[in-house]
């Protein structure tokens, strides 16, 4: 099952709604919820697109809940971490160092020393991905410092534990750490500027021209760093495969060039970035990206191709599986002030665009709903202008089946037929618009209407935008969908808000409390 398939997500709401209401009753609101069936479906889709011998690792920055990391480990995914903190969480989840990679733009000396110590102890990380010549030099210093203190006996003992070519080399019994060099492919990722990492102006990675300096800083082919290949990551939420294809092509070409002088240079890690869009928005699935690889590899001489290929998906594995259950605090009816209610400027983080009142088409009252989940639980709408659908679980105290799903059903069916044909996409848009208009007419009499949903935080950017919802009152329940990635992982205690609980809905429908709600004592 494609984890980005709108139909699958639509079907899951009908199954999950009773469980979401029960979670609110049992654990309170707001609460993070993970649908394990959706996680398993997403993992199966990625595994099908990138089967063995691909090395697959889950990027913890998407959602670092140890219980979730452990579930993904059981589904064949190691861990990609960007700090000792994430490394500790992966270890707590049962992932061995041999299946953990350390990356990230902000590795400290302490992070690098920890990687060197792990190698010295005979339990090295799979590799460390280096971002700059400075970082290569810092890791080399850390390795040399530990190596100088090791006894010959310790070296031989550690080498015997790492006969697979990682950590210590058995032949040279000197401490070495496997590393990749992160390539900045200098391509246009065609995504939100806040999610782009492979552009020329990005802070991430080394350009091709900077590679030689990093190799020298790390001590060259015989130094304390064993250079194993290249890592690249174009960006997140990639709307098309073109930029990814160009980046992988450049990575393969550079790897082939460097492999001539570095026999150990045998690995290409292509990162992640596979998109998950709001329902009804067409995006390429992981298989679309994977289908680019055979032609790219065929263009490289056989003796210069990578022996190991790796991916590091994050969002695509967990985003669709996540929900936030929240409770209504206020409902207001207002005629807009001398300026349309502030809306997020989709072009930039944490900025507002105010539409002049003259631009309004009528003076109808606007329904405003404030819920008890906000930017502290889901930062993405305020940070990126990300869109997350809000659906009603109860209306005036009674359980409801969200008519919003009908909108998504029509849009999803239309977009699904559109594929990549421009004319089909135009027809799909018209079909979706017509379906929404019919829903407007059918639901108006029953009180369903567009409602602006805001959070409880003392910031005007704390809003989730407009959503079609039934009549609501204080105490009613709503759910925010597609929050499994960069929701709980980016939460904050701003305004003195404790951490919400995190609950799994198991495949059989039972509930598992994966993390308890934080108390007031946990603040400060």
Language-model segments: residues:
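Short acidic/polar capping segments at secondary-structure boundaries
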Residues: 106-107, 133-136, 144, 184-188, ...
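Short acidic, glycine/serine/threonine-rich loops at helix termini
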Residues: 69, 92-93, 112-117, 139-143, ...
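A charged N-terminal "starter" segment
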Residues: 1-133, 137-144, 150, 165-167, ...
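Active-site loop/helix belt of alpha/beta enzymes
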Residues: 148-149, 155, 165, 172, ...
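Conserved, mostly hydrophobic/aromatic
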Residues: 39, 61, 83, 115, ...
């Amino acid at each position: 099952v494609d984890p980005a398939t709108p139909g699958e997500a639509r079907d899951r709401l009908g199954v999950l709604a009773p469980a979401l209401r029960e979670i609110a009753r049992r654990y309170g609101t707001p609460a993070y919820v993970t649908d394990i069936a959706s996680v398993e479906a997403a993992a199966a889709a990625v595994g099908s697109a990138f089967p063995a011998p691909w090395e697959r690792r889950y990027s913890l920055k998407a959602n670092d809940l140890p219980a979730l990391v452990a579930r993904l480990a059981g589904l064949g995914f190691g861990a990609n971490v960007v700090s000792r903190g994430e490394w500790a969480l992966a270890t707590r989840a049962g992932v061995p160092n041999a299946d953990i990679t350390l990356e990230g733009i902000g590795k400290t000396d302490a992070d690098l020393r920890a990687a060197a110590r792990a190698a010295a102890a005979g339990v090295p990380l799979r590799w460390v991905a280096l971002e700059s010549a400075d970082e290569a030099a810092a890791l080399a210093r850390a390795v040399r410092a530990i190596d100088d203190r090791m006894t010959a006996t310790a070296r031989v003992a550690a080498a015997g534990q790492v006969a697979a070519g990682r950590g210590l080399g058995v032949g040279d019994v000197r401490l070495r750490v496997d590393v990749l060099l992160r390539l900045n492919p200098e391509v246009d990722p065609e995504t939100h500027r806040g999610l782009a990492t492979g552009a020329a102006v990005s802070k991430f990675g080394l350009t091709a021209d900077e590679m030689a300096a990093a190799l020298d800083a790390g001590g060259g082919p015989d130094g304390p760093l064993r250079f194993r290949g290249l890592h690249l990551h174009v960006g997140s939420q990639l709307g098309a495969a073109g930029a990814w294809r160009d980046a992988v092509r450049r990575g393969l070409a550079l790897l082939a060039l460097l492999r001539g002088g570095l026999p150990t240079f045998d690995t290409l890690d292509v990162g992640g970035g596979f998109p998950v869009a709001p329902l009804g928005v067409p995006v390429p699935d992981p298989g679309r990206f994977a289908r680019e690889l055979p032609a790219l590899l065929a263009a490289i001489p056989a003796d210069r191709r990578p022996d190991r290929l790796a991916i590091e998906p994050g969002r695509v594995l967990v985003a669709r599986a996540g929900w936030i259950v929240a409770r209504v605090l206020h409902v207001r009816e207002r005629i807009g002030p001398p300026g349309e209610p502030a809306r997020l400027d989709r072009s930039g983080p944490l900025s507002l665009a105010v539409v002049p009142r003259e631009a309004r088409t009528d003076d109808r009252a606007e329904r405003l709903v404030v819920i008890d989940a906000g930017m502290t639980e889901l930062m993405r709408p305020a940070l990126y202008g990300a869109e997350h659908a809000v659906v009603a679980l109860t209306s005036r105290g009674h359980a409801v089946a969200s008519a919003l799903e009908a909108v998504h059903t029509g849009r999803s069916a239309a977009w699904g037929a559109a594929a990549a044909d421009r004319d089909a996409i135009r027809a799909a848009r018209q079909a979706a618009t017509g379906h929404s208009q019919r829903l407007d007419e059918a639901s108006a009499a029953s009180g369903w209407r567009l409602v602006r949903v805001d959070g409880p935080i003392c910031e005007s950017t704390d809003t989730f935008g407009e959503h079609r919802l039934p009549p609501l009152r204080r105490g009613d329940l709503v759910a925010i969908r597609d929050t499994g990635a960069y929701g709980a992982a980016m939460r904050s205690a701003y305004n003195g808000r404790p951490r919400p609980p995190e609950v799994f809905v198991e495949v059989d429908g039972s509930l598992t409390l994966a993390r308890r709600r934080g108390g007031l004592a946990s603040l400060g």
